[in-house]
Amino acid sequence: MEILIVNDDGIYSPSLIALYNALKEKFSDANITIVAPTNQQSGIGRAISLFEPLRMTKVKLAKDIVGYAVSGTPTDCVILGIYQILKKVPDLVISGINIGENLGTEIMTSGTLGAAFEAAHHGAKSIASSLQITSDHLKFKELDIPINFEIPAKITAKIAEKYLDYDMPCDVLNINIPENATLETPIEITRLARKMYTTHVEERIDPRGRSYYWIDGYPIFEEEEDTDVYVLRKKRHISITPLTLDTTIKNLDEFKEKYGKILCEM
């Protein structure tokens, strides 16, 4: 069995080793390959490097664990992992474990989900796994984050085992694990919430009197009860949202009947 691990937090994210070990414990005969960006790539979505060359370096992450650092995006990591390193589509690709949750329709901006969708696009069973971090100070502390990823990694590996056992009608499983989860934390199947954050723009002035801007926002908690936001943030349960690559409107025939002539007649 071939398993590819990628992320958007970078090759030195502490979650990579924890996930590798959990997968090795669950799938002892698997060949597990880690390919991750050289630098932090959060918020990059499914961007791909088309106009600049990519560098790839082998990196020792632990005593018996090596990975490949790629000077590009998470999507680049998936492509190089499949077509340059493995030379074939792996049985499973796991993107994560992300430092911070990936919820709602805002997953479109996530590098973690971008990599997962890219893997699915090439025919691999694909999982995106993220750990809720409630402290912004910890979320953006990156390599020094004092969080034990062992339990989230074991949860991810257990879900991956079940995912591989069945032919589920989805392209990506988006897993979000609450902070301080245990192996007994309940799991729920959810749908995407509309938003996970409010949107706010902060204007500041540089020493030369020119404006510059930070885009930020505050977490949203009040969403419908069957959404990932509600299940993770209000119920403190693990959320699994099955996703598809095809984002076409669900009721296409109804849309065509109602708006086809309006849109198509010139």
UniProtKB/Swiss-Prot annotation:
Mind telling me what this protein is named? 5'-nucleotidase SurE
Q: What is its EC number?
A: 3.1.3.5
Class of enzymatic activity (EC top level): hydrolase
Q: Which residues bind a divalent metal cation?
A: 8-9, 42, 98
MF terms in GO? 5'-nucleotidase activity; metal ion binding; nucleotide binding
**What Pfam families does the database record attribute to this sequence?**
SurE
Family designation: Belongs to the SurE nucleotidase family.
What does the record give as cofactor?
A: a divalent metal cation
Cofactor binding, per record: Binds 1 divalent metal cation per subunit.
Among InterPro entries, the record links this protein to: SurE, SurE-like_Pase/nucleotidase, SurE-like_sf
**UniProt GO cellular component terms:** cytoplasm
Subcellular location(s) of the protein: Cytoplasm
